[in-house]
């Protein structure tokens, strides 16, 4: 962990920014008021998709924190507007794939991270041609795969949260 060195690596700083942007998109900041919620994301067994796993798990932690603020009377209602999930996709050996494992991610020709809300709207989209450039059609195909994956993750989040925020 970077905290042991008291310094963030560039990769950790980028992940931190992505997670922060993604989670802020879920919240009505005015309703939250003058509060800070710290979400610490440790991916204990990262096998590719660390950034998006941090977003998806971080959202559950955020929802639980907001629920506690409501239960303890600090907020009248939850400031969360939307569920947020993130998933990665890529092109490996010319084949579009969802949720790449490390062995696939390390040889991906194209890598894409997609964060969405439960309405299917894109919050963050990061795509990189690792071994080659990619076409708009390929990007759209990867985004469709990510939308499917995000819908599956949304079901898991709702189940973990008892179906409510």
What are these regions (language model features)?
Residues 1-165:
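Polyanion-binding surfaces on beta-sheet-dominated domains and ring/shell assemblies
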């Amino acid at each position: 962990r970077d905290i042991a060195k008291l310094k963030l690596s560039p990769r950790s700083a980028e992940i931190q920014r992505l997670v922060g942007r993604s989670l802020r998109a879920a919240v009505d900041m005015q309703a939250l008021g003058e509060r800070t919620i710290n979400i610490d994301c440790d991916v204990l067994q990262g096998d590719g998709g660390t950034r998006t796993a941090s977003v998806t798990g971080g959202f559950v932690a955020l929802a639980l924190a907001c629920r506690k603020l409501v239960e303890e009377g600090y907020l009248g209602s939850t400031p969360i507007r939307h569920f947020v999930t993130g998933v990665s996709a890529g092109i490996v050996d010319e084949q579009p794939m969802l949720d790449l494992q490390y062995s696939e991610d390390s040889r991906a020709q194209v890598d894409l991270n997609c964060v969405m809300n439960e309405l299917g709207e894109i919050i963050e989209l990061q795509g990189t041609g690792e071994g080659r450039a990619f076409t708009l059609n390929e990007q759209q195909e990867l985004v469709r795969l990510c939308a499917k994956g995000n819908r599956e993750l949304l079901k898991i989040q709702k189940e973990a949260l008892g179906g409510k925020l």
